[in-house]
A protein has these predicted regions:
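C-terminal-most transmembrane helix of multi-pass membrane proteins
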Residues: 41, 210, 246-296
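C-terminal transmembrane-helix exit sites in multi-pass transporters
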Residues: 52, 102-125, 250-271
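Transmembrane alpha-helices of multi-pass small-molecule transport proteins
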Residues: 31-79, 104-107, 157-164, 179-197, ...
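Glycine-/small-residue-enriched transmembrane alpha-helix faces in small-molecule transporters
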Residues: 1-38, 44, 75, 79, ...
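Hydrophobic transmembrane alpha-helices of multi-pass small-molecule transport proteins
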Residues: 48, 101, 119-138, 267-288
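Specific transmembrane alpha-helical segments of multi-pass solute transporters/efflux pumps
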Residues: 55-94, 100, 136, 218-236
Length: 296
């Protein structure tokens, strides 16, 4: 019989496959990044609220001491999705996803700092290798330097969100945390777009299959996937979570190549750099697992 950890790990791989599909959806949907994220978070929060009202009204309850953390989580995840989809819009799926692969490295560095543990030597070694890969990607796709930089910042936000939620799920109901983070993120995003003077009816106007794609993005790839991803954090470490998320670029890039073919093809150096990033992250994870096994 597989252990609870193995079941949760397998489930999370499926969730990451859905996350990989969001990058494709982001490219398929015609509206810009901020309205897209508002639709995504707003509809996802609405779907969870409807589920609570019909089946579990008590799920609306959130302990007072978690409110400030949930508020911060909503800001971080909203900013992460806006920067991620913006990077896709200006640089393409492959470039945005290649930078998201650095999330495990960023977590390996930030987690010890935030949680007060010693930074391990092997994390620095594999981190340096990852930096070499990122350097190659920057050099190979210099014309997309803005998109690369924004996607890298998005990976940082994703890492911070994972570490923050890794703490909260130990004391809060995952689906409740999901709802309030999505709700906070959508409200704050709406306030920003209203007061920035950028709000127009046209920016929220959906064309052709946009409604269909946004529905999949909001309900399947967000309400469902977001809740499950937080739930498995009770059984998996922040580093393991980010290790699996590092496979998202592989899923997403394969999907984008299948859908758009040569449009998403990039230079040889890009793929060499991407391979170095993925390899160093996977080797880091394998090494960490071996070290943990030796302690038992």
């Amino acid at each position: 019989m597989p252990s609870d950890r193995s079941k949760n790990l397998l489930l999370f791989h499926f969730i990451v496959l859905l996350f990989g599909f969001t990058s494709v959806l982001g490219a398929l949907i015609s509206i810009s990044a901020l309205p897209l994220v508002l639709y995504r978070m707003g509809l996802a929060a609405f779907g969870l609220a409807l589920y609570f009202l019909v089946f579990h009204p008590n799920y609306f309850y959130l302990p007072k001491h978690l409110w400030s953390k949930v508020f911060l989580g909503g800001i971080i995840i909203g900013a992460h999705w806006v920067t991620f989809f913006y990077a896709i819009k200006i640089a393409g799926v492959s470039i945005a996803l290649s930078m998201m692969a650095t999330g495990a490295l960023i977590t390996a560095i930030l987690d010890p700092i935030i949680n007060g543990r010693k930074l391990l030597g092997y994390e620095l070694i594999f981190g340096s290798l990852t930096s070499v890969g990122i350097g190659l990607i920057y050099q190979a796709e210099f014309k997309h330097i803005e998109g690369i930089s924004i996607a890298l910042f998005s990976a940082l936000l994703s890492s911070l969100f994972t570490i923050l939620n890794g703490r909260m799920v130990k004391i809060g109901r995952p689906i409740t945390l999901s709802f309030y983070e999505l709700f906070v993120g959508s409200i704050l995003g709406l306030i920003i777009i209203l007061f920035s003077g950028q709000f127009t009816i046209e920016s929220f106007e959906l064309k052709d299959l946009d409604i269909f794609w946004i529905s999949i993005l909001a309900f399947l790839c967000t309400s469902f996937a977001f809740n499950i991803s937080i739930k498995v954090m009770r059984h998996l470490s922040s580093f393991t979570i980010m290790m699996v998320i590092s496979l998202e670029p592989i899923y997403g890039i394969i999907l984008s190549l299948l859908i758009w073919n040569e449009k998403e093809y990039l230079s040889l150096n890009f793929y060499v750099g991407f391979l170095i990033v993925i390899s160093s992250i996977l080797m880091s994870g394998i090494y960490k697992l071996k070290k943990e096994a030796q302690k038992k």
